[in-house]
Structures are given as structure tokens and as C-alpha cells.
Amino acid sequence: MDAQAVSPKTSVMKKGLIAAFVTVGLWTTWIIGTRSAVSGASPLDPVLLAFIRFGTATLVLAPFWWRLKGIPRQCSPKIWLGLLFAGLPYQLMVLWGLHEAPASEAGPLLTGSLPLFVVAISLILGERVSRIRLVGVGLITLGALAITGSGLLAFDQGHWRGHLIILGAAMSWSIYTVAFRRSGLSAVQAAACVSLWSTLLLIPFGAERIVSALQATPLQALLQQVLLQGVVAGVLSLLTYTTAVKYLGPSRATAITALTPATATLAAVFILDEIPGVVEATGSLLIIGGVLLASGLF
């Protein structure tokens, strides 16, 4: 009888954990690929990248937003507004931030600060957070600061602008995280609606830049970004992350996805031949330890 009672809970936990760790892999791929796209020899326009991300997702997920007629009726205006923070505000701030600061600094700030913001918002909304999870969030925060500390102090390089923008992006994603938990929507419904309205809001203000950038960008580069921004970031990562939030809750899901700075550092070693220093390695270890505590895995 006890085994039967525990089994469904264990199954739900496994689904959430799988979704969260898949999200880590997708985010790592996206951060490194996007940094290369906006800071290479021929950087792509961030507005074009945003259009590719949300436009592709809007087409792929069309059946879902069509059934909802674009606006989920069960959501209050506040919840609906909170969901939209995962759209244009988040995407444009990430692209801008990655243009101003290296991925090795922006990555830890973006994903490492998510648990901190989510826990803060949850506490404001009256949700209970265990002490052990708070300790884990503290370790994650220390790890992110350790990795980015040298960059934050070097103001003359201008990286601090990217750091501030990335923190704004993390706050936007955290607002979405808490809003989704209270929305009653499925992962695919939330992703579909966010993509649709982000595309509709972007076109009137960025149409001229989008057309100009499309004409100037090689077809191969466009196809690569359709895969990276549209499929990986616009559809897959949003679905897997939202699924993780559904099964694990906001605090636990964001704690696991805070592993991204560590995985991004490892990816940089093997893909970009960037060997992390002692500070970066220490920060990654702190983040991993914080994730284990804040996620409730042990």
C-alpha cells in the first residue's frame, strides 16, 4: 500500500528531473550559439534573432494557440502579463546582454540568479521555502558571483552593462516561472501563446530592421538560427522547462537549471578550447552543490 502511494509521486519527480536536465543541455547549446551569433565577425541583428525564435515557434505551435484563440481565458490579466515576460522582454535582454558580455560571464548570471529571483518572488507571494533550499540558493548565488566577479570589477571593459541587462532577463524569466505555475496551462499551451504574442508585438516595431537583416544574412546562417533560436530555444527549451516547473515546482526546477553555468563552462572547454581558471572552477562546484541542496534530490 505504501509502495503504491509513493510510486505516482516518484514517477512525477522523474518526469520533472528529466525535463529539467534536458533544459540544461538546451540552454547550454543556446547560450554558446547565441554568443557566437551576436559577437562574431559578422554579428546578426538581435531583432532578427528574436523574430526567428518566436516566428518559428508560432508556426510550429499554431494548432495549440489556435484552439485557445490566442488568449487563455482561464488566466487573469496579471497572470497573462506575467507569462509574456518569457517573450520579448527576456529574449531581447539576453541578446543584448550577450552582445555586451562574454558567455562565460553572462551564462552564470542568467541561470545562476534564477533560483534567487524565483525564491524571492515565491516568498513575496506567501509560498513556503524550506531552509535547506534557501541554503542551496545561497550556494548557487555565491557560485555565480565567483564566476562573474572579475568581470564585474573590470568596469572599463564595459561588461558591467551586459551583466545588468542579463540580470533583468533573469528577473523576467523568473516572473514567467511563477506566473506559469499559477496559470493552469499546459507547457505547450504556454509556449504557444507566448510565441504568438511575442511575434505579433515584434512585427509592428521591428519590421523594417527584420527585412533589412533578412536581406543581408546568408541563407546558411539563417537556417542555423532557425534551428537554434526557433526550434531549440523557442520550442524545445520552453516546453522542457515549463514541464519541469509543472512537476517539480518553480524553486526546485530553477535550482536544477542553475547547473547551466557549469555545463556551459565544460562546453567552452571542449568546443571553444577555453580552460576555466580556479575562480570559474570553484564557482561551478558551488553551483553544483547548491543545485543538489535546492532541488531536494538528496
Located regions from the model:
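Glycine-/small-residue-enriched transmembrane alpha-helix faces in small-molecule transporters
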Residues: 2-51, 142, 152-182, 200-204
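Hydrophobic transmembrane alpha-helices of multi-pass small-molecule transport proteins
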Residues: 61, 129-151, 202, 258, ...
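Cytoplasmic-side transmembrane-helix entry/capping segments in multi-pass membrane proteins
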Residues: 20-21, 75-84, 129-141, 162-163, ...
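Transmembrane alpha-helices of multi-pass small-molecule transport proteins
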Residues: 2, 42-89, 117-121, 172-176, ...
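Hydrophobic/aromatic residues within transmembrane alpha-helices
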Residues: 37, 49, 53, 97, ...
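Specific alpha-helical transmembrane segments that line the substrate/conduction pathway
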Residues: 48-58, 95-128, 169, 250-269
